[in-house]
Amino acid sequence: MKPIRIEYEGYTITTDKQAMQPEAIHRWLSQQSYWSKHIPFEIVKTAFDNSYCIAVLKDGEQIGYGRLITDYATFAYLADVYVEEPHRGKGLSKKMVETLMEQDWVKGLRKILLATLDAHGLYAQYGFTPMVISERYMEISRPIVYGDESSPC
């Protein structure tokens, strides 16, 4: 699959993993996210390596990220979407999600899931809705796996 590269408002949106910085992703997820505080670098790197990733770059520095965990045929789970605080309010999360959702292979997926505490409005713009029949879904949840008991996930 050929990497995407879009210039947007002085930022670069790309799916090229060679341009991404796993150390920056780890730093943000482990220190700033509410869903994976204290996550070890090795886990972030393994997740990165095994996902379809998208990033926002400013002058070569990674300031945003998201990933689809997918089989590329029927299912995907959208995860770890963020934009660093100084760059928020510029439509960058929206542009990342839009770029992902516009891919032909993504349009052909039967189911795309995500979990969010505070970005329902963003995802609703792309067709995401609350689960209607949540009784069909089951989960194993281990919220303290990275040693942070305050995580809401």
Outline where the language-model segments fall.
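A conserved beta-strand-loop-helix scaffold within acyl/acetyltransferase catalytic domains
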Residues: 42-59, 63-82
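Conserved acetyl-CoA pyrophosphate-binding loop and the N-cap/start of the following alpha-helix
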Residues: 87-96
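Hydrophobic pocket-lining residues that define ligand/cofactor binding sites across diverse proteins
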Residues: 104
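Conserved active-site alpha-helix within GNAT-family acetyltransferase domains
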Residues: 108-142
